[in-house]
Amino acid sequence: MNQIILWGILVIPWFLLLLLDKQRVKRFFTVGLFAALMMTIAYQVAEKMHWWTVQENVFFLTSMGATIYCLHIVITIFVFYLTYPGFILYIIVNIILDLIHGYVIVPFLAKIGLYNLYDINHFGLFLVMTTIAIILYLFQRLLDFIFEESPA
C-alpha cells in the first residue's frame, strides 16, 4: 500500500498542471525546479543532522522523499500561480501549507511508516519549510528582474 501512495505522490500531481494556463506554468516552472533543489539540500542537511529520515521510498530514490521530485515542484508552481506577486498572500498561504505539512502530513507519513522526525520537532520543520518559501519568493523576484531587464 505504501508503494501505491509513494507512486501516487510522484506521478499524480503533474496532471494537475494541465488544468492551469500553460504560459503561467512556464513562468513559475523554474522556481518549482529551484524548490526541488532547495528540498534536496534540506534533505541532505537533515540526513547529516539526523533531523528526519525517509523510511520507505520508491525503488530508485534513497534518502530523498518522493515528494521532492513532484509534489514540492507542483505545489510551488500552484502557490506562485495563485498568489504571486503579492508577498503577503504568498507568505500566508505558505504558512498555512507549512503548518499542514508539519502537523498533519508528516505525522500521517510517520504513522504509515514512510517518514520519521528525530532531532527536529514539528515547529522546527515548519521553520525550515517557511524559510525555504521565503528563499523561493526572492528567487522568483530575481528571475523577474533578470528577464524584465533582458533585451527581447
Predicted features, each with a name:
Residues 1-152:
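Aromatic-rich, lipid-facing transmembrane alpha helices and their immediate juxtamembrane interface loops
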